[in-house]
Amino acid sequence: MIKADLKIINGQIYNTFTRQFTAKEVAIVDGKFFQIADKLSDDFKFEDILDLKGSYVIPGLIDSHMHIESSMATPTNFSETAIRFGTTTVIADAHEIANTSGIKGLKRFMDQPSLIDTFFAIPSSVPSTNPELETTGGIIDLEEVKELLADPRIICLGEAMNFKGITSEPNSLIRKIIALCQKKRPRMPLEGHVPNISKEDLAKFIFAGILSDHTQQTPALIKEKIENGMFIQLQKKSLNKENIETIVKNHFYDYSALVTDDTMADDLINGHLNSIIKLAVKCGLPLEWAIYMTTYTPAQHMHFQDRGVIAPGKIADFVVLNNLDGFSIKNVYKRGVPIDKLSIDDEKPFASEEYHSIYVPNRSAKDFTLRVSKDLKKITANVIEIAAKGTFTKAVKKELLVKDGIVDWQKAGLALLAVQERYGKTGQLTLALVSKSINKSGAIATTWAHDHHNLMVLGTNPDSMAIAYDKVASQQGGYLVVKDKEIVANVQLPIAGIISDEPIDIIGHKLKKVRLAMKDLGYVNTNEIMSLSTLSLLVSPSIKVSDKGIFDVKTQTKIPLLLAGEE
């Protein structure tokens, strides 16, 4: 007699290798699938029987590229929400906390308890470029990488994103990190951040060892990257009919996966990887393949041999669906246990230094003005133009009026962007000009500014900017909106300036108010928060800002804000 935990009857079970649902009975022993059969024998003694009455069963969902910090929640609070939507395993690249708090903060983050299986990537690019271009709270160097490689929770190298370091600097830190990983863990996947890169530059990435990409794709990029041996992780912004048609037409299912990358709290309260599945299906991906690309292919890519399929010996993580048409989730099981019976009893607090991480000088409205020679009447400026979709920007030149030595950027319909070093290292402040952002009186301030997470303020008048700056600094981090002189929306992020200790639903409610307030100020983008928060991301094309200046992303060279003036 075989003692078994659970018997599943009257279920339609997904078979990974045929991509079909068939009526089967399932036996679970010690939290693993033991047998899947038309009818189980009488040799079992079951503790419990689950009658699904025709419901559908698929493996637990695996998210092979994501950032927990994007939810602005602790790993524990994130897991309690994500598991409800069928996500049972994630591979988290926690480079945000590494940027703010270094390896000590990263390890404390990794030690947080979780209802889901959380594996981690080595943050490969902390800082995202190099310390000469941006100031961060921590740096992940070779010694830190060696330490992390010894941790069994580390299963891949996180997205390598330093374009110049990978393609044209043989002795760069990122090249040394890649070489170390290849030596110490030769089978470990090396993840990439390869936006809009093709031909010879793409070959350089792949030759260096980078074999995956999760950035925004086009049909041509998908085809070129996969044909050159890359594994493609499709996130929300890459899901459209044209891209999905490329996957389907070329039968690229085994070389791609669906991922979340960044899911903010106001989206997470409505869904996680299941939402990506629904969108992919809406764009033309057959559901059976969407399931395949969120269970089997991510497991294979990450070299998991113990999960991703419903088969003997695999971990019994599974999702019960009411129906296939709406991908409606009835229940989720972790190692054969329904999630309503799971709990976390040993939460670990973050260190006090994570709660006191903002060290900035006092600023007033006069700090948010552009001063030039009083002899000038006009001046030409390099302006960052925001796109209405996605996070790419471009540089445009605009001629601005000057009055009494002050540049009148407001009259030109521009906003001022300020990035203040927040770690108490230099106190440096960079100013930039932005078009197609907000157009009403107010400001937005945040310490959730990828990837260096310095204090960033965008505003249309200096008084509003000073109010926003002071508030986000005094509360040790956050994301807030000031309309005129009133704070109208505010998410407090007291843990390292990027994480809240509140539940997801509360964070989500507050973040939704921030998003609406940004729209009210005139910010137009498919994802306002990511659009603003990546104005500081020096690896996202094409013009971005740090505490150390305005930079051309591809060449990593500094660009002056103001050019020639006219008297």
From Swiss-Prot:
InterPro entries given in the database record: Adenine_deam, Adenine_deam_C, Amidohydro-rel, Metal-dep_hydrolase_composite, Metal_Hydrolase
Gene3D superfamilies found in the cross-reference section: Metal-dependent hydrolases, Urease, subunit C, domain 1
GO molecular function, one term: adenine deaminase activity
EC code(s) of this entry: 3.5.4.2
Cofactor: Mn(2+)
Reaction(s) this enzyme catalyzes, per UniProt: adenine + H2O + H(+) = hypoxanthine + NH4(+)
Pfam families noted in UniProt: Adenine_deam_C, Amidohydro_1
Keywords: Hydrolase, Manganese
PANTHER family tied to this protein: ADENINE DEAMINASE, N-ACETYLGLUCOSAMINE-6-PHOSPHATE DEACETYLASE
Family: Belongs to the metallo-dependent hydrolases superfamily. Adenine deaminase family.
Identification of the protein by name: Adenine deaminase 2
Native species: Oenococcus oeni (strain ATCC BAA-331 / PSU-1)
